[in-house]
Amino acid sequence: MPNKFLYTLTFLILFSSINVAGKNDDYIKTSSGSISGYIENKVINYVDIPYAKPPLGSLRWKAPREISNQDQIISSKVGNHCIQEPSSMGGAPGEGILTGNEDCLYLDIKTPNKKLSKLLPVMLWIHGGGNTSGLKDIYDFSTMVNRHDVIVVTINYRLGAFGWFTHPAIQDNHKGIDKTSNFGTLDIIEALRWVNKNIELFGGDPNNITIFGESAGGHNVLSLLVAPQSKGLFHKAISQSGYTTSTSKEHAHINNIDHPTYNHTSNEVTKRLIPDSE
């Protein structure tokens, strides 16, 4: 009997010390679907929420399109980071030449697991990685959420040639904002639009949004400070180890022509990757 009691007591102590992920059955209906969170590290996690239409087919190398699908139930997806080379240095793991998916415009939200008496400040994280690698899941902001009573949003955005690419086969066949080369920047702006529209449902204050990022993410923060499309979508900005350059639009296009991605991609191949209609 003493041994049985000791085993039971030991089991209870060990079990109570393990951080077990729990389910939160309350569904939140957003503009892109309904989602329930799960509790882990003392915060509620809402993961893999689509914030724009998948940039596939006719939407490849175009500005992100607003998503509106309130009737769908959002479920977590495996491998939804944007296409990149596998990397163990702040990027997505994997084997081979490439990992990831073009269908990658998703965001995660972390909120305190407590009853809120007021709307909380919102912080939107932009990951680094040279704008060629990285993903929304690389850091865990649970401690920040718990310690400072904030809501943290992390996002994926298109990388590499899918995110920043100037080519006659693209620009000559597009109009308006679709003619831009800065698709990754526009993804971040679309994520901010989604947050402004939906974050109050999660207890966040749409009038108190801070963008923050490190390295290339810090560079993207600086880009958003001057992008007219982002005006009014955030209120504070933190650039960690960010960098920026000053160049004209014309000179930027000249630099792009010298880039190997441009020189090694023919008009014919690029056009075949862009269907004629949406």
Residue locations for each model-derived region?
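Mature extracellular catalytic domain of secreted serine hydrolases
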Residues: K77-E95, Q171-T180, N208, H219-S223, ...
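Sec-dependent signal peptide recognition
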Residues: P2-F11
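Alpha/beta-hydrolase fold nucleophile elbow
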Residues: F202-E214
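N-terminal signal peptide c-region/cleavage motif recognized by signal peptidases
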Residues: F15-S17
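Glycine-rich nucleophile elbow surrounding the catalytic serine of serine-hydrolase chemistry
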Residues: N131, G213-S223
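Alpha/beta-hydrolase active-site loop
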Residues: C104, I177-L201, H259-H264
